[in-house]
């Protein structure tokens, strides 16, 4: 049984895709042990609680300095004995000691086809604004292992999505979530569960 922690900062739509995929059997032999958010108002915490999953808020604002926050975040994952850490819209820089502790056991979803529109500053709608400004015809999503760089870890899976001439950043974001992110993240977790 693969035990996972899902780290998320906002609405938790990728978290919901994972929860639903476990419920309907697209992800097997996997249990979400905890959902951790840095944002006490994150809807993801509600989604977790509704699904009967432990939901924890660990915010940098709760700690005197960043090192104390980093230690608390790592400890929160460690004490739950997880095998895989899933970053599903986690808008906090992951501590280097956590990356080292979970080397090749931490994955992230990014809303573009890496190496395009990734790295520092490319998150949320910024990614889709950049894609539209550049005039690309295809965008998509990538699941990758996390390393010390920003969106630089080894790619596990990608899925392309058509960019339409009348797209707005919001419309493109939604299409990439529905057609790519919510599909490939569950597939990758299931692959890892059976590796």
Language-model-detected regions and their locations in the chain:
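One-carbon transfer enzymes
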Residues: 1-195
């Amino acid at each position: 049984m693969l035990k996972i922690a899902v780290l998320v900062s906002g609405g938790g739509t990728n978290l919901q895709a994972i929860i639903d995929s476990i419920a309907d059997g697209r992800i097997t032999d996997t249990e979400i042990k905890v959902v951790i958010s840095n944002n006490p108002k994150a809807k993801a915490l509600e989604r977790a609680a509704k699904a009967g999953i432990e939901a924890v808020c660990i915010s940098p604002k709760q700690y005197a300095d960043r090192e104390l926050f980093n230690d608390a975040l790592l400890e929160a994952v460690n004490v739950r004995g997880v095998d895989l850490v899933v970053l599903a819209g986690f808008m906090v820089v992951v501590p280097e000691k956590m990356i080292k502790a979970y080397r090749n056991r931490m994955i992230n979803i990014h809303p573009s086809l890496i190496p395009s529109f990734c790295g520092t500053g490319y998150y949320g709608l910024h990614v889709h604004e950049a894609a539209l400004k550049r005039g690309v015809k295809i965008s998509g999503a990538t699941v990758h292992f996390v390393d010390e760089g920003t969106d630089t870890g080894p790619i596990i899976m990608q899925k392309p999505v058509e960019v339409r001439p009348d797209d707005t950043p919001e419309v493109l974001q939604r299409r990439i979530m529905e057609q790519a992110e919510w599909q490939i993240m569950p597939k990758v977790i299931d692959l890892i569960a059976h590796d």
